């Protein structure tokens, strides 16, 4: 009887370890028109058992971001700029995204090159761990394996047509 329970427990742990990632940072919409001003939304869920306390997004070189919606209540926003003054990313901090919750961060941008744009993001949790969403983007409809709390997960991708 005890051996059966141990086997069942081991199987449950193995299944959880191989579970697909059900939540990751997304950029919406996933398909945009070339040279059209677009409202982009970065959707950030908290998929760990620790709240999210900061989010950094690196903008793809093929998209010019030029305006930001106000940061959600309790959050501050800091634009990241290149040496030439162009906006290359944004950092949101100061608030929390509770366990099981999500928050949207919105800004305007214009894509100026066709093809796939990759939006790398870095999610900081209340325990100080940073989850890089900087790996290769998933294929449409694919669900990646969970890579753990600090290993790179798939970056978000937007197709420019």
Name each model feature, range by range:
Residues 60-88, 136-139, 153-158:
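A surface/secretory-pathway sequence property marking extracellular, secreted
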Residues 35-40, 104, 116-119:
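Short, solvent-exposed loop/turn segments enriched in Ser/Thr/Gly
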Residues 1-8:
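Bacterial N-terminal signal peptides that target proteins for export
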Residues 8-18:
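Bacterial N-terminal signal peptides
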Residues 19-23:
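Sec/Tat signal peptide C-region and signal peptidase I cleavage site
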Residues 32-34, 124-161:
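Extracytoplasmic/periplasmic copper-protein system
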Residues 95-115:
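Low-complexity, intrinsically disordered segments enriched in Ser/Thr together with acidic residues
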Residues 35-69:
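Low-complexity, serine/threonine/proline/glycine-rich extracellular segments that form mucin-like
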